[in-house]
Regions:
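His/acidic metal-ligating clusters that form di-metal
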Residues: 55-65, 196, 203, 219-314
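C-terminal motif of bacterial Sec signal peptides marking the signal peptidase cleavage site
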Residues: 16-18
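Extended active-site neighborhood of metal-dependent phosphoesterases/phosphodiesterases
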Residues: 78, 82-234, 316-379
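A short C-terminal boundary segment appended to hydrolase-like catalytic domains
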Residues: 361, 369-402
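Active-site environment of divalent metal-dependent phosphoester hydrolases
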Residues: 38-40, 74-76, 105-111, 211-215, ...
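Structural recognition of the beta-strand scaffold that forms the well-ordered cores
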Residues: 28-33, 64-74, 97-102, 106-109, ...
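Bacterial N-terminal signal peptides that target proteins for export
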Residues: 1-8
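N-terminal active-site segment of His-dependent metallophosphoesterases
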Residues: 22-83, 255
Length: 402
């Protein structure tokens, strides 16, 4: 009986640990993405500037966690093992633990010829791989996306259940360790994690941008291969199961808010037709339904489109601000401030499926161009801000240029 009573007390304490109690401390998170970028395979300027940028974040005594929303190089740079390891080596210098979700440029788009992959030859029905001066394939595994994702996992997620670096190691819950037993293949997604800080649940999802959730046929082939179709289907289903798991945990722990971290800007047309973002609808649907059921602030961070933006694309006509030039102060979204290639200035109209989720907010992190910057996110358990351009619920944020 005594042991049973003790078990009940411990279980209650565990539940309270995630709750919105007054004892939760205020914390600060640095959010970055789409960096270091190069304008060509030989442009190393941002890569060489990265250690100083990391040090600038380290020098902020408030920061206790770093998030990277994906893309460790540009779409004009090659996918090599040496480069992936070099960036990982730089990240070891972060004083705070780093949580990273992969971007399209380091795996899903590695097949592209401009990234050193190759191109489909209609005459032969085979792939003409990009070769270096010695006749060797430029990219790791010839740019095969699945192989490059495995490479990223082997470097950045070699220790499942642990964040990257930091002077004090941080544990996370990985889908590789906590997958649904009914779907054992989900254990492959070591990059999908969740964890809690100050009564806020954070969750990452592997959703690559720029290619309609990796459905653009690899190497420019006429249609997706069986391997590509399997990749897309398995990852998408695993993502949605993981998102549901995270929200279930947030609700059972009475967390005060949820942060979602992924790479794709699912509302950016990027110069293509609206049909080129349809494969993201499944994730938007899942986010919208889970956020609505949760009923508390849900904040999404993404990269991909490179320009700082703050809005709520799950509400038609919601306020929106956008960076009008690299480093410029954000201005209201309209036809003058939003590039035409992006689509409608109201992001809801790029995915207009009847969403009405007032407790949601999205921030696209500045990336790609200089001046380099990071987003300083403060989580104050005592705050309850209205949904605005730079604050929502326990969150407030500002752009920082070192």
């Amino acid at each position: 009986m005594r042991n049973r009573a003790l078990s009940i007390l411990l279980a209650a304490a565990s539940l309270l640990a995630g709750c919105g109690g007054g004892s939760d401390p205020k914390i600060t998170v640095a959010v970055i993405g789409d960096m270091p970028y190069g304008t060509s395979p030989t442009d190393t300027s941002q890569f060489l500037a990265n250690p100083a940028f990391i040090n600038a974040i380290n020098l902020d005594p408030d920061v206790s966690l770093v998030l990277h929303v994906g893309d460790i190089h540009s779409g004009k740079e090659f996918c090599t093992e040496a480069y992936d390891k070099a960036v990982f080596g730089q990240w070891k210098a972060f004083r705070s633990p780093l949580v990273y979700t992969p971007g399209d440029n380091e795996w899903a788009d590695c097949h592209k010829i401009k990234e050193g992959g190759g191109s489909y030859n209609a005459a032969t029905g085979k792939i003409d791989f990009a070769l270096d001066a010695k006749g060797a394939q430029i990219d790791y595994a010839g740019g095969d996306p699945v192989a490059n994702l495995q490479l990223v996992r082997s470097i950045y997620f070699a220790a499942p259940g642990k964040a990257i670096g930091g002077s004090t190691p941080m544990a996370v819950h990985s889908q590789a360790q906590e997958f649904d037993a009914a779907f054992p293949a989900d254990k492959a997604y070591v990059e999908n994690v969740w964890y809690e800080q100050s009564g806020v649940l954070f969750v990452t999802l592997n959703v690559p941008g720029g290619s309609n959730n990796d459905t653009d046929p690899w190497y420019g082939a006429p249609a997706m291969s069986a391997a590509q179709a399997q990749e897309v289907s398995a990852r998408s289903q695993a993502n949605n199961r993981w998102l549901a798991t995270a929200f279930q945990r947030a609700m059972s722990n009475a967390d005060r808010a949820v942060v979602i971290q992924l790479q794709a800007d699912m509302w950016d047309l990027d110069g293509a037709a609206p049909s080129h973002v349809t494969q993201y609808k499944q994730f938007i649907d899942a986010i919208a339904s889970n956020a609505k059921a949760f009923g508390k602030p849900v904040l999404l961070f993404n990269g991909d489109s490179h320009v700082y933006r703050s809005d709520n694309p799950l509400m038609a006509g919601a306020p929106c601000v956008i960076e009008t030039a690299p480093g410029a102060t954000a201005a209201p979204c309209n036809t003058a401030s939003v590039p035409a290639a992006t689509g409608n200035p109201d992001p809801y109209l790029n995915q207009p499926y009847g969403y009405n989720v007032p407790n949601f907010h999205r921030v696209t992190v500045h990336g790609s161009t200089t001046p380099l910057e990071w987003l300083k996110l403060t989580i104050d358990p005592a705050a309850d801000a209205a949904n605005g351009a730079d604050a929502f619920g326990p969150f407030n944020w500002k752009r920082v240029k070192p």
